[in-house]
Amino acid sequence: MKLEQSKIIGLQKWVFIVSVLLLLFKLTAWVYTGSVAILTDALESIVNVVAGIMGLYSLNLSNKPKDTEHPYGHGKVEFITSAIEGVLIMVAALFIVFEATQHLLHPQAIRSIDFGIVVLLLTSAVNYALGWYCSKVGKQSQSVVLMGSGAHLKSDTYSTLGIVIGVVLVKLTNALWLDASVAILFSLIILRTGYKIIRQSVSGIMDETDMLVVDQIVNVLNEHRSKQWIDVHNVRVINYAGFYHIDCHLTVPYYINVNEAHQQMDAFTALLHNHFNGQVEFFVHIDGCVPQQCKLCQIQACSHRQTDFNALQDWTRQNLLDNAKHGLQ
């Protein structure tokens, strides 16, 4: 197992452990205060615990090596568990709306408000610190699970702070309706967080092109392009939880032999392999150039040239994604 993957799994274990502890603290605060706003926070923490378990499962499964039944590995499971986490978040938010509505219709006095405020402030500080670190490591490793955990924990922090403000206002004004109103407000924020996690997960499941990754490929190839690479087109990028599969067509001079073409392909893939720190595999189709592309070709000493070199064409996101050789329009 790679050190990086061990770090990711170890961090997810801490997410689970901390989520359980924070849940116990918040449930205690709810029992002591009877605040539906604090119940809102506790319910979201239950989702954190369930998400932590699923995250650990998916990380361990996604780390399994490829096999004949899963030739691209098991990384897609991270998208599935993240989608389930998003659904759970939205269900919790809807339950909060229901409970808060009941409290609006039948207000109840809040007890031990100071105790509840202190507990929420402490848990929010722990949540934000852990969420920030999860987001940082998740972005570095392209782990969907960690990025989802980080986003969830940080949003939990913001909602907790908002709930603290609401509880403080209840204490100052004795307006019990504020407790339920704050709960409803932050349940809507939680709903939005759940939707964003589901949206990101569905993008991964449906192999939606990550344009930021495509832009990285464009920049690297433009900076290090070889004269032998006439063009690159029909680029397809699939993200398997931080491990990329790249399909593309590489156009080379039509007259070079198979061994020479293979050498160009090796140089091409090595360039991207280094950029993605080895977390990538390729399927490269070799095309031969056509006479219309002579105007783009930098190989001046070419006995097969039919048209003078005109100008070097920049490789862009659009012409790399298009399934067409460059210069034929």
Predicted segments — roles?
Residues 1-216, 320-326:
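Alpha-helical transmembrane cores and adjacent cytosolic helix/loop segments
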